[in-house]
Every structure is written in C-alpha cells, then in structure tokens.
C-alpha cells in the first residue's frame, strides 16, 4: 500500500525508477517541453505482480499523481481517496535577490495512457472522503484503525479486486 496523501511530488527520476519495478513493459511518462519535443521514459518487462493500493487526496500532486495515474493506467493498483491536486508540470525555481523565488513551468508530463491531469487531478477508483471527525486532527496522529480511507483500502485487499485478479484472502 502506497499512502501518497499529502505528498506534494518530488523527483521525476526517482519516481520513474520505482515505477519501472512495478509496471510491465511500456511507457511510464511522456515528457513534452515548451517546443513540443517529446521524450518517453519506459519500463522494461520486469514487473512486480502483487496487489497494490494507493491512497491519495487533494494534496497529492505532481510526481505523486504520476505514480498514482501510472499504476491506475496499467490496472496495477486500486486507488482510494479523493481527487488529487492536478499538477502535471515540471518547474524550476529561480532564486531572487530578496530571498524569494520564482517558479517557472518548463515541461508537461503525461501519464502512460490517460490524459494529462493538469488542473483536473486524478480520480480514484473509490472516492472516499476522510471522516469529518478527522479533518481537524493531525494526519500523522490518525491511527490506521480510525482512518476510514485506510480501512477501505484494507477491505478491498482482504475481499479481493477484479482489477488485478486478486482472490479473497482466506
């Protein structure tokens, strides 16, 4: 289970390296620069064939969304939570003399087969809002037992999923 809730993204090279271990042969990401030049990063034929779950929410962004969407595109994971943020761009930060910075988007990245999620986000397979009673609680202090999104993911793993041909645990 990958808990990507509140994950703002990260290093594209790192995420594609991890996805290469998880996905079958095929595209991981299509990167398009400002001139329209496209680069495709692909996975080899070595894949991990186990049931996978991803937890996401409106604070899952950028490379976290690519990870979520790539697993979803290949039918390798069930996605539980709420719509992600919607950031399908790569940025560079230019430091300014007043100690502020300017973020400039310079590339778009598209998931393997889905449309770019820029401004839209990734829709989970199971839309599950975090219980209202937990909204004011520090996410890191919510136990697995009281986390209804986590409990839904565990329920799917225990009961099986047609998506990745998992039989009910005995």
Question: Where are the language model's segments positioned?
Answer:
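Structural recognition of the beta-strand scaffold that forms the well-ordered cores
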Residues: 1-3, 29-31, 51-56, 78-81, ...
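Terminal peptide-recognition signature
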Residues: 2, 52-55, 71, 114, ...
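Short, solvent-exposed amphipathic alpha-helical segments in soluble enzyme
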Residues: 2, 18-20, 68-74, 95-96
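C-terminal recognition in membrane/secretory proteostasis and scaffolding
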Residues: 3-8, 31, 129-170
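Gly/Ser/Thr-rich loop/hinge elements
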Residues: 8-62, 89-94, 110
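Extracytoplasmic/secreted proteins, especially bacterial periplasmic and envelope-associated proteins
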Residues: 13-17, 23, 62, 66, ...
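Short, well-structured beta-strand/strand-turn elements
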Residues: 74-87
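Conserved P-loop NTPase
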Residues: 91-94, 102-136
């Amino acid at each position: 289970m990958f808990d990507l809730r509140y994950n703002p993204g990260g290093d594209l090279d790192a995420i594609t390296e991890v996805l290469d271990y998880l996905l079958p042969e095929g595209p991981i990401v299509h990167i398009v620069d400002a001139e329209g030049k496209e680069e495709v990063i692909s996975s080899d034929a070595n894949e991990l064939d186990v049931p996978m779950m991803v937890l996401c929410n409106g604070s899952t962004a950028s490379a976290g969304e690519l990870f979520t969407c790539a697993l979803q595109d290949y039918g390798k994971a069930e996605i539980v939570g709420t719509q992600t943020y919607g950031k399908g761009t790569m940025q560079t930060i230019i430091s300014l003399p007043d100690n502020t910075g300017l973020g400039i988007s310079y590339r778009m990245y598209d998931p393997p087969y889905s449309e770019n999620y820029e401004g839209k986000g990734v829709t989970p397979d199971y839309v599950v809002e975090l219980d209202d009673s937990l909204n004011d609680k520090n996410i890191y202090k919510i136990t697995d037992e009281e986390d209804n999104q986590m409990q839904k993911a565990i329920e799917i793993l225990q009961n099986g999923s047609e998506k990745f041909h998992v039989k009910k645990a005995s």
